[in-house]
UniProtKB/Swiss-Prot annotation:
UniProt GO molecular function: nuclear receptor activity; RNA polymerase II cis-regulatory region sequence-specific DNA binding; SMAD binding; steroid hormone binding; zinc ion binding
Transmembrane feature ranges: none
Entry's localization field: Nucleus
UniProt subunit comment: Interacts with R-SMAD daf-8.
Any one GO BP annotation for this protein: negative regulation of transcription by RNA polymerase II
Chief subcellular location: nucleus
Function field: Orphan nuclear receptor which, in cooperation with R-SMAD daf-8, modulates the Insulin/IGF-1-like signaling (IIS) pathway, perhaps by regulating expression of the potassium channel exp-2, which in turn modulates the secretion of insulin-like peptide daf-28.
Protein name: Nuclear hormone receptor family member nhr-69
DNA-binding region location: 3-78
ZnF start-end (NR C4-type): 6-26, 42-66
Lineage summary: Eukaryota, Metazoa, Ecdysozoa, Nematoda, Chromadorea
Assigned keywords, A-Z: DNA-binding, Metal-binding, Nucleus, Receptor, Transcription, Transcription regulation, Zinc, Zinc-finger
A GO CC term assigned to this protein in UniProt: nucleus
Length: 373
């Protein structure tokens, strides 16, 4: 007997729902979209790839595919929610949060690909399938490292601004979170981008230049940072086979840190972190069930959370290296890096962060993120 697949995302189907053969994920997505009367917009040309691993990337194209597959909105207009409110606030809430995070990450990748000329055409969801041409890949220079940090900072701000949990905060608390989490988020992003590499002991920067561990000594005193990123973050991620959903959840948990300096109202930050933590735990449970693994939810999510102390320690070392590089004139430390990485702005200096927070999402990316051809 041939097992049917979901006609929307090609995942394993659980039967016919609202008129189409689909999985529970697409069933729930369609139900929520119709009941809450969501109106989605595609940022591209309404032809995004909707597969099991990418179905959360574009909700407009996913809903469009649900309709094309045969799902009928009138099939749920008068349907009673037999699941009840309690279950709705667990599974449905978890997927809504994950949708937010994946959408925010997708936005960053879209912005990144529009400003970095050497960006691979593959999205982050294909990370495990990336095949690098190492003969053509360029080794990173010290200038690449400085530019990469700047570019990631700009995208980091836009990522944060796209999250509802962040936009509800007072601007002073937004700035405190950005300053407190910038270096850690940079380290996490570099590490996740590097797990797809098939070559050993190498990290991949935001502009797709490669920095092997043995080459790091030639581009300033960052050899230790590169080695620690590989040994303490990249290799454990590979062993755990971390996926995109786990990555975006861990990124949010790392970012919404209620104990960073200068936070005035910790409560909404704590609530956001706890919600994302629940999402990560549920994702780990789902993954264990999908793969029929004996590993418990707590065990897998615990292993992922154990990456956080190393991420923060490496981030602090990165900050110290940037300070030394600036002291010896090895790298151009611009105002954004001074404000977010070094937290070394004078009251009289222009506050780039304040301006960025006051502007709409994506309004300053084209002006801020530049790469010389």
């Amino acid at each position: 007997m041939v097992e049917e697949i979901c006609h929307i995302c090609n995942d394993k189907s659980t039967g016919k729902h609202y008129g189409a053969i689909s999985c529970d994920g697409c069933k729930g997505f369609f139900r929520r979209s119709i009941r809450k009367r969501y109106h989605y917009q595609c940022r591209f040309e309404q032809n995004c790839d909707v597969t099991k691993n990418k179905r959360n990337a574009c909700r407009a194209c996913r809903l469009q595919k649900c309709v094309k597959a045969g799902m009928k909105s009138n099939a749920i207009q008068n349907e009673r929610d037999a699941i009840g409110k309690r279950k709705k606030t667990t599974g449905a809430e978890k997927e809504d949060l994950i949708d937010q995070l994946v959408a925010a990450e997708t936005l960053c990748q879209q912005l990144r690909s529009s400003v970095i000329k050497n960006t691979s055409s593959l999205a982050p969801y294909d990370c495990g399938k990336v095949k690098w041409n190492y003969e053509d890949a360029r080794a990173a220079t010290l200038d690449d490292i400085g530019k990469s940090i700047h570019q990631q900072l700009v995208l980091f701000i836009e990522w944060a601004k796209s999250l509802p949990q962040f936009s509800f905060l007072a601007q002073a608390d937004q700035a405190a979170l950005l300053k407190g989490g910038a270096a850690s988020i940079i380290v996490l992003g570099v590490a996740y981008r590097s797990i797809c590499l098939t070559v050993e002991n190498t990290i991949c920067l935001a502009n797709d230049t490669l920095l092997p561990k043995e080459h790091a000594t030639q581009v300033g005193d960052i050899n230790c940072v590169v080695g620690r990123i590989i040994d303490e973050i990249v290799n454990p991620m590979r062993r755990l086979n971390m996926d995109l959903i786990e990555y975006v959840a861990l990124k949010a948990i790392l970012f919404f840190n209620p104990v960073v300096r200068e936070i005035n109202d910790q409560s909404p930050v704590e609530n956001a972190r706890y919600a994302f933590l629940r999402s990560l735990q549920r994702r780990c449970t789902d993954k264990a069930l999908e793969n029929m693994e004996d590993e418990s939810m707590d065990c897998r999510s615990g292993k992922l959370l154990l990456l956080l102390p190393s991420l923060q320690a490496i981030a602090q070392q990165l900050v110290e290296d940037v300070q030394l590089a600036r002291l010896f004139g090895l790298v151009n430390v611009d105002s954004l890096m001074e404000e977010l990485i070094l937290n070394d702005m004078k009251p009289s200096d222009p506050q780039i962060l304040q301006t960025s927070l006051a502007s709409p999402v994506n309004s300053s990316v084209k002006a801020e993120v530049e790469l010389e051809e």
